[in-house]
């Protein structure tokens, strides 16, 4: 059975056009699967919004090409254009919309507009991308946060789990394992 994801995405530009970045949050069953953000150089806020959408859909497609996706964005323009209710007049926006459609099967994606205050997580990531801007380099790799360690406070130590498999023991043929109820 195909998985179901929620994608919230946001983009921002300081100057419009100006330095721009995006943030995207991928969730499954209410749990965050991935946080993505990237600085994209000088662009408009609409270009940054589309880039966040494309990054999120691309990531979801890499997890499960047949997954259904609920996209939630505070950009009325992107939501309405991707839903087919508004025309896409500018050629650069048409190209970005085509990239978004190519990133994941359009029939598996549903778009919803949400108020800005419900998109604060993706907005924070977009601002993080802008704050961490790396001097205008043209080659950027989107950052995926390791959700288990990158969100720790400075005084916390990440838990390390080791799975050790020892192979067969004298009890293996009898199916007697540590913690089992057999005597």
What are these regions, as identified by a protein language model?
Residues 66, 136-138, 179-181:
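Short amphipathic alpha-helical leader/targeting segments
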Residues 38, 84-86, 112, 175, ...:
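Flexible, active-site-adjacent loop/turn segments at secondary-structure boundaries
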Residues 12-16, 53-126:
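RNase H catalytic domain
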Residues 41-43, 82-85, 155-158:
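N-terminal start-of-chain detector that recognizes signal peptides
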Residues 88-89, 93-176:
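Terminal low-complexity/intrinsically disordered segments and their adjoining alpha-helical capping regions
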Residues 1-47, 51, 58-63, 161-167, ...:
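RNase H-like nuclease fold core
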Residues 20, 34, 67, 107, ...:
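Residue-level signal for beta-strand positions within conserved beta-sheet cores that form or flank
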